[in-house]
Amino acid sequence: MANILYITCNLKPREQSRSLTIGNEFLKRYSERHPEDRIDFLDLYRDPIQRIDTDVLNGWGKLRTGASFDLLSEDEVRKIGRIGALADQFVATDKYVFVTPMWNLGFPAELKMYIDTVCVVGKTFTYTESGAVGLLRGMGKKCLHIHSCGGFHCGSADDHSVPYLKSVMNFMGIEDFRSVVVEGMDALPHRAEEFMDKALAESREAAALF
């Protein structure tokens, strides 16, 4: 049995969201093939994602000097605890599915906040004399990024979403990365149905291989 973490970052309801529609098709087909797997859901807009703020930095600084949690403020303990819980959940996961829209050539800020909570020294990567090393390497972990763009950006220098997420996953040691992207539906609305059908088919293929 594998643990799946299905991470969404979208304010729209599913029926109005292209990426969530494709993600739902993937989930349906994947669940049919792997009914024994456990799927956990994380909605980055509705679940509390703790940003790294002054309390977090101050608390981490105290812990690095050898201080115990008893010497941290209530806010520092609460915030660092939430970040630790998210990082532990990430480490314990076998397969990750990110579902995002493109916003201004990237993705919503909530996803960057989440990435900052799971890229943790000593948990997902470490530093060596030769550079940073991902601690999740060699564990067979996989990542799928389902993404939507109104224009045509995939593979261009303007795309700061899919390549960035792929780079971050590799940084932590997750080398098996694939993506399903629907794009151009706003640029060429008369072909929107065609583009969506293609992405849905790709999501079904991804479910068979994931």
UniProtKB/Swiss-Prot annotation:
GO terms for molecular function: electron transfer activity; FMN binding; oxidoreductase activity, acting on NAD(P)H as acceptor; oxidoreductase activity, acting on NAD(P)H, quinone or similar compound as acceptor. Binds 1 FMN per subunit. Pfam families: Flavodoxin_2. It is an enzyme of class 1 (oxidoreductase). Keywords: Flavoprotein, FMN, NAD, Oxidoreductase. FMN binds at residues 17-19, 102-105, 148-151. Its cofactor is FMN. Its EC number is 1.6.5.-, 1.7.1.17. It comes from the Bacteria. Quinone reductase that provides resistance to thiol-specific stress caused by electrophilic quinones. Homodimer. Belongs to the azoreductase type 1 family. This is FMN-dependent NADH:quinone oxidoreductase.
